[in-house]
Amino acid sequence: MNTLTLTPGHLSFAQLRAVWQQPVQLRLDSSAVDGINASVDCVNNIVAEGRTAYGINTGFGLLAQTRIATEDLQNLQRSLVLSHAAGIGEPLDDAMVRLIMVLKINSLARGFSGIRLSVIEALIALVNAEVWPLIPAKGSVGASGDLAPLAHMSLTLLGEGKARWQGEWLPAKEALKKAGLEPITLAAKEGLALLNGTQASTAFALRGLFEAQALFASAVVCGALTTEAVLGSRRPFDARIHAARGQRGQIDAAGLFRHVLTETSAIAQSHHNCEKVQDPYSLRCQPQVMGACLTQLRQAMEVLLVEANAVSDNPLVFAEEGDVISGGNFHAEPVAMAADNLALAIAEIGALSERRIALMMDKHMSQLPPFLVKNGGVNSGFMIAQVTAAALASENKALAHPHSVDSLPTSANQEDHVSMAPAAGRRLWEMAANTRGVIAVEWLAACQGIDLREGLTSSPLLEQARKALREQVPHYTQDRFFAPDIECATELLARGDLFRLLPDFL
């Protein structure tokens, strides 16, 4: 099990990926305690002095002008959580809930939220005991924060709603009891601190980024395999070409292709003196297209890493000055735009892969048997597998539509511009699954193509990629039930069998 000592505001990309991938035992670094306590003292002073401060002793949203009596402050926070837990849809899986909770803990522990250490520790206890609140996937517009998802998360702290413990959905109070935990009572501002923030949006987009990273690597390997299968040239990957343009993503993508292809191979030597002058764009322009995608991945990582360590609560408590200031850090526009750009990259990675598959189907372009199978006519080979890839690539074109340009006013027009970041991030998961399916078909096709270059081999890394597939999926000598092979290749991709062949590139 992964152990993580959390220094608030300093989560790394590798740590975030690890939190998503496996259970974690959290410990809060002691350096955070003074800041947390100071922010609570500031809130308590405001209550004691009778000053009016939004979210502490007022209503919320359009009801912000309503002053709440001191004796009602605890009930105010509980009511907020209950009323805002209005999500809908399938429950998020444990990995997503875990990532959301760790992001929330990281933000609250920065000491700008006026929430007691004991509440943060209660969240940490849920993570460590693997008690996972039931959080519906839908219901947030990404401003004012991810209210509904985070309210569902917070219900479990109060012993309300449902939670999963040891794989079973239980009433939250029962799940807490089985895990040796107890419900808590919220004090002034604490319900709002728990609910306000971009943690669900950020977690959704981070998962999209994690998957896009693996897809990018897999597509580089499969693109190189296809280049070999159709007797493509290594010349378009020459470093001098890409240095002349100067686009960093393109330069680095070309380097990755050179890494997996190496300088030559038996296949490359077999057509060294051929008369072909140029390859089709789907081969020749791989560094340019994949480089542009790599740039989007890197920019998204930069934005999402900042947001993962951000304070996106409202209002914020500045304990040193004794100020509580309302702002808009809950607005997830940076996350929405990052997710939209990731969508473009995921779609293009799949679109380029599909074009390479189509290239292999055409005997005139590939110099291989039609549809990569002998005795064509009796056998249809990869004919419909390519159609499946085309269908998936086409779906992604519609899914890539930007969400950040959409907005619907909420809360009686008080919250009149929103980010739609949760939907922007969540659709990335479907897009990633589609692109993974496309790449799986290309992997199958490219290995079949290389098999058909009888007696010739590719580079050592590409032969590793071919061996990894051939250990599970045999060569096609004649038609057989195709879907299980695509499913198998997809599972191998999801496991990271090709991802691990590349050095770190983000």
Curated annotation (Swiss-Prot):
GO cellular component annotations of the record: cytoplasm
Entries under NCBIfam families matching the protein: hutH (TIGR01225), PRK09367.1 (NF006871)
InterPro entries given in the database record: Aromatic_Lyase, Fumarase/histidase_N, HutH, L-Aspartase-like, Phe/His_NH3-lyase_AS
Family, as annotated: Belongs to the PAL/histidase family.
Cross-link (5-imidazolinone (Ala-Gly)): 143-145
Protein name: Histidine ammonia-lyase
Keyword NADP listed: no
Pathway the protein takes part in: Amino-acid degradation; L-histidine degradation into L-glutamate; N-formimidoyl-L-glutamate from L-histidine: step 1/3
Superkingdom assignment: Bacteria
Subcellular location(s) of the protein: Cytoplasm
Positions carrying 2,3-didehydroalanine (Ser): 144
